[in-house]
């Protein structure tokens, strides 16, 4: 992990913006598209870049904006990485989003997001908060292989139910579907059953498969060779 003083935080325009407080990830997911060379990481993917001045940048930007909109986060790094537990940069950004009455939609695989349930509830009451979470497999043993450092599917499903009970809408990313690993009808039906039970408002499949772009492809194939010899 390394810290930087970023020059900017928000990207996008119009009705929706994005931000990445963390760039890179320590979840270790073998299928992660964010490893792709097209994103031009100048550091090792696991050496997470932390924008330590993110709250200050967000405050300065939102203070100038007259039109309220949604702010998404989590495309280039989970906003609730283990480091967030101590750094609290995401929480500080949520406080700013709440203060300026903007909406927010974080994408995560971590139930650490429950720490910020109070802020997300407040934002949802004034603007809109939509929690997005990725689910890939009902097989916890497989999950430990393909996404080794994230919460279990059971723990993530529990978090979704808690948000449901708090009236905060949720969306599930049912992706990726990995050939010969989690592509069974039993698995897809099991994940959909968890979504129904949690009352999610939408399911995103994003084509279901992987992009297999440069760097992402090599990392995934190496993982297949280690854990599932001959499958590649």
Protein language model features and the residues they cover:
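Short, electropositive alpha-helical surface patch
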Residues: 87-88, 121-133, 182-200, 225-229
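Active-site-proximal loop/turn and secondary-structure-junction residues that shape catalytic pockets
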Residues: 77, 110-112, 135-139, 176-178, ...
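Histidine/lysine/aspartate-rich catalytic loop segments that bind and position anionic ligands
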Residues: 136-140, 149, 166
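Short, well-ordered secondary-structure micro-motifs
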Residues: 117, 144, 183, 215-217
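Conserved Radical SAM active-site core
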Residues: 1-132, 140-144, 153, 157
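Acidic, Ser/Thr-rich peripheral helices and adjacent loops at domain boundaries
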Residues: 217-232
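Conserved C-terminal portion of the radical SAM core fold
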Residues: 155-215
